[in-house]
Amino acid sequence: MTYALELSRLTKTYSGGVQALKGIDLNVEAGDFYALLGPNGAGKSTTIGIISSLVNKSGGSVRVFGYDLEKEVVNAKRQLGLVPQEFNFNPFETVLQIVVNQAGYYGVERREAQQRAEKYLTQLDLWGKRNERARMLSGGMKRRLMIARALMHEPKLLILDEPTAGVDIELRRSMWT
């Protein structure tokens, strides 16, 4: 069976000997919903960073839909959509520019990118803000923009790091339905 995500004996030791991860094993089947829960400093963001290849692991292996993250990084990353904890888009670009540009990074044709932008921005109630600069959005709208951006190449696996941070109760409810 090919899993959506396979972590095998995953370890991470930072400089100074701080061990963030110690032998993590996890198999996630396609279609499953998982949450990493734990206190601050438990290694949740480190794990997400390794899965998304933003943080180097110290040991173990990561496979995304069968692709080894070390040996087949391009194929593995094409399967992933990441919504990071921090907003990391150009605040001077418009909402539409941000999502269409993201699709382009993955080779999505401009016409298709425009269609996907309308689809995801509408689903996330941002279509009416498509021509606004990202810096003008509220925190909750920025969070939804990050989700729309992560969906633009239609990944098979969506990774969300603190997806409801700074989001009001009503939006949290709508995000999970």
What do these predicted ranges mean?
Residues 60-68, 75-76:
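Conserved ABC transporter NBD signature motif
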Residues 133-137:
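Conserved ABC ATPase signature
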